[in-house]
Amino acid sequence: MEQIIYTEKTDGISIDRIRRDAAFSMPRKHLHNEYEIYYLLEGERYYFIDRRTCHVTGGSLVFIDRNQIHQTSQAGPCSHERILISLDPSPFSEFLSSTGEMSLPGFFRCHSGVLTLDKEEQVRAECLLDDAAKELHEKKTGFRHMAMSNLSRLFILAQRHMSGSSLSPVLPLSTQPKHRKV
């Protein structure tokens, strides 16, 4: 069974949260022109990105660059819950780069892959994503700015985690051809 908790969209940004209680695997590898952030709240997945397959567990963020081949498939128990964000290059890229401290293409070029958050970061990430979706749903004055602000804070959270952590990002399970067939 699939339960859509929310699905929201505005110019250049879409965000949805889905819980699946049955086994689910994407039918095929794909790519698209949007940047993608996949946050696994609970469950286990295999995530194929380019030529590597990573084991992703609850509390992990997956950053997928534009036009990067990817696919997710079942690992472990059948159920999982995830939040998926798709970002067009515009308008979010301009918003994120407005201070000159970060750029969307630069972030994804350097940080494509899996990042496992600690418990405190997981709570913050989930709140930021849920709040962004709430802004897009309610459409109050300034909702786009608030949604993009929350997503910017998610990027900063991820960048600080990566720069301040002595832990390495999740390593691929394998780069062997037989494991590329997730």
Protein language model annotation of sequence segments:
Residues 42-44, 61, 67-69, 78, ...:
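Short, charged/polar surface micro-motifs in flexible loops or helix N-caps
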Residues 111-120, 136-149, 156-182:
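Short, Lys/Arg-enriched, Trp-marked, Pro/Gly-tolerant hinge/linker segments that flank
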Residues 1-61, 68, 100-104, 112-113:
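Generic protein-terminus/edge-of-domain signal
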